[in-house]
Amino acid sequence: SSVMKKIIYIVGALMLLFPALAGAQALPFTAAETDAASLGTAGANLTQTHSIAGAAFSNVAAVPFSETKFDAAAGFTMWQPSAVKSNMINVGAAYNMKNKLGIALGFMYGMNPAYDVTDASGAVKGQFKPSDIAVNAGFAYRFIENLSVGANIGYATSSLAEGYSYGALAADVFAMAKFNNFKVTAGVANIGTAVTSKSGAKFGLPTSVAVGAGYEAEFAENHSIDVLLDADYYFMGAFAAAAGATYTFKDMVSVRAGYRYGGNSPLPSYASVGAGVKFAGVKLDLAYMLASGPMKNTLAISLGYSF
């Protein structure tokens, strides 16, 4: 549509307006999906409308298209246990008001391995445990039947050493369209303020132009499938893409699988599998990463409630 063409044009213009965001990246964890439902499809979730609890860290413009009125979940992720050995806690909720307005809130806390702190003589005087925190809020409006727009805004911070932490404001802006079973979206993710180090060097966030497409269908009454495809072009010059699918039986049992090509982006390549069960609104989701690199053995679990 002409509206989507204008959005893509604006996104292209933003790439020219923010050359300072290229190069080394700050707060790379802001580019990661950590909730179990999204990790089950290798992070492909921009047009996902069934599990919307994590929309504050993804695409809030999808919320007004959801058949769910309210969705909340809390999760725990063993992030890259074969490499960085971090643990992440995430909490999210989204509310779909009359399929017109969408509101989302999200919180993420990352706990990284402790390291020894030494004094000038080299003697160990204690330990420090680095941490990451992100808080997001989003709002979306579906102004015509087939089209919505939405924006998330939040603050992310990393504490790297005692007395040394840095943070940045960041936003995601998306438009999404849905035509029968097909869904498409385009926008900018993680656009925000630069981070300045103690030396005065500036580092940009992992900002990307993001597009997504999806197809969902129900068949033989009790079966449904949701196929998702996302792609990101990072202002640093890297490209990434993810494809995933979810099969659901009677809106009670789901199985998921996906693959992400990471290239030189902030997140490496990996494959994933996942599963979920739902009963009386209570849902449990699991995801496991299959990879030979840093994502090997990453495991996510979440417990939520939706209606």
Regions found by a protein language model. Name each.
Residues Q25-F307:
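Subset of outer-membrane beta-barrel
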